[in-house]
């Protein structure tokens, strides 16, 4: 059969920016501190416009109170590293757990666009795949290419204090707590 033109059912760059604005403004209105790290798609935009990630966010949002990292990861407190990986895996949290072992901190990661947690027996470390903040049907390479990617899932994390982490799912309208983790000592 004839294939549809991906432009007919994937979002334009402008509509993707509108989604991003919506998500960031939503989080900013809900939480006192919101950390944002760039990912692989942001690097394309940064290179194209020859702008830093912070300059892109500032231009896109105008005035905001987001905490923008120039790096693809950040360390929070002494027990948590959060960031965007270069690779992905179909097992939620597996790559995050490998990062957790490497950094000796619990790890929360993006890039695989799925939610879930991984740990091993007797380990004090958690590896968590956060999910994504996107409209899955609008992602060109997911819809228009022949691939084995698992279904994308939206999610994020809320660090309530130094040791309490809520893993959240979000369908664009409703937020739900998927799991609450107590982040104990990692040593």
Walk through the language-model features, giving the residues of each.
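Conserved beta-sheet core of the metallophosphoesterase superfamily
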Residues: 79-170, 175, 180
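Core catalytic region of metal-dependent phosphoesterases/phosphodiesterases
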Residues: 1-66
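Short acidic low-complexity segments
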Residues: 64-79
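Glycine- and charge-rich intrinsically disordered segments
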Residues: 181-187
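Acidic carboxylate-rich catalytic motifs and surrounding loops in phosphoryl-/glycosyl-chemistry enzymes
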Residues: 36-41, 72, 167-172
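Short, well-ordered coil/turn elements that cap or connect secondary structure elements
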Residues: 29-31, 62-63, 77, 102, ...
């Amino acid at each position: 059969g004839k294939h549809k033109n991906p432009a007919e059912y994937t979002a334009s760059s402008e509509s993707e920016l509108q989604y991003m604005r919506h998500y960031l403004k939503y989080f900013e209105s809900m939480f006192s501190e919101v950390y944002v790290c760039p990912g692989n798609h942001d690097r394309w935009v940064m290179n194209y416009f020859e702008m830093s990630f912070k300059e892109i966010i500032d231009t896109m949002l105008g005035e905001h109170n987001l905490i923008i990292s120039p790096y693809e990861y950040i360390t929070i407190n002494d027990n948590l590293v959060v960031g965007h990986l270069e690779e992905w895996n179909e097992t939620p949290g597996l790559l995050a757990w490998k990062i957790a072992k490497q950094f000796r901190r619990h790890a929360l990661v993006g890039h695989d666009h799925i939610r879930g947690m991984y740990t091993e027996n007797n380990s004090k470390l958690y590896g968590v795949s956060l999910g994504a903040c996107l409209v899955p049907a609008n992602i060109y390479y997911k819809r228009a290419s022949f691939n084995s990617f698992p279904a994308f899932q939206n999610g994020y994390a809320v660090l309530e204090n130094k040791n309490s982490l809520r893993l959240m799912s979000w369908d664009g309208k409703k937020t739900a707590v998927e799991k609450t983790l107590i982040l104990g000592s990692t040593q």
